[in-house]
């Protein structure tokens, strides 16, 4: 049974910003409070991850001391009773949408999120971080090998060249042998699942699934990306799509804001702290994900509509220690040529043959950098 999202909101989240605003404007009218489409918390407003996920309440930090609410329909009777007993604060209470409150709370915490994205891993788990490119042991090992090669070449140059070539030949032969093994394994593999994800169909049985898409200088790809993500076969109220944009990339920000109109997709602006890289953008967004599962796509990706259901079904059938799945990536070119066909063959060999045999042998898998699915976030 899927875990329930503790921050799950009613279905208006999935209907788009316009419908969401209309719903909360009506709730403001029923409460006798003002509705505001945008939330201004001022400088130094308090914000934490739980408040961002809930997106039901925020307090401004300036002299106005305004309180912004995004009440569920079921909460309205209790709020009316509270207002009747406490009429004085009514003027400082405003109703807004969860999207507007969430955006304001993220903005209030963005410096902390950005700082954590840059340094949290290297501080907490330095051996898993790439901030230090070469360790002391690696540097010493490299120097030792170089010294041995230089010494051997000075004493017996011909024998050294032969030895280096033999070692290289063995390594290249190993790669070739792996591909032959992979080809034989692929020929014996059963066909892929025909009924993708049919083990789970009811929306109530599905968890919230987060989709992260980091973008940089890719404004021309945004419309096609949004159309492809809109076709994903997953209940829209249980889909958490976040487009991650750099604050200096104005063209892509403008294209994204235009493309996501009428959807529940969220735009996250990554502050200009540290490097403008895909890992930093993903680390910035990860604490804000609502989903128990998360996948990463690139701007040029056009995921199969059934990919999330297939991934979730695979997680359900897999041992609990399986935390990541790599989807197959198929290369498509609008104007194919010889080079693009060779590229497509290379990708097909990797994702349809080499990676499956590495998985069957229990060996480490090189991830493709996109279409990776992760579980166990909640």
Predicted regions and their residues:
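N-terminal membrane-anchoring/stem segments of glycan-assembly enzymes
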Residues: 107-203
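N-terminal signal-anchor transmembrane helix
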Residues: 177-211, 215-238
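Extended, hydrophilic extramembrane loops/domains of integral membrane proteins
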Residues: 83-119
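Polyanionic, low-complexity intrinsically disordered segments
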Residues: 13-85
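Short aromatic/hydrophobic "clamp" motif used to bind/position activated sugar donors
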Residues: 294
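Acidic donor-binding segment of Leloir-type glycosyltransferases
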Residues: 230-274, 316
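Long helical/loop segments within the catalytic core of UDP-sugar-dependent glycosyltransferases
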Residues: 260-264, 269-287, 305-378
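The conserved acidic donor/metal-binding loop of glycosyltransferases
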Residues: 298-302
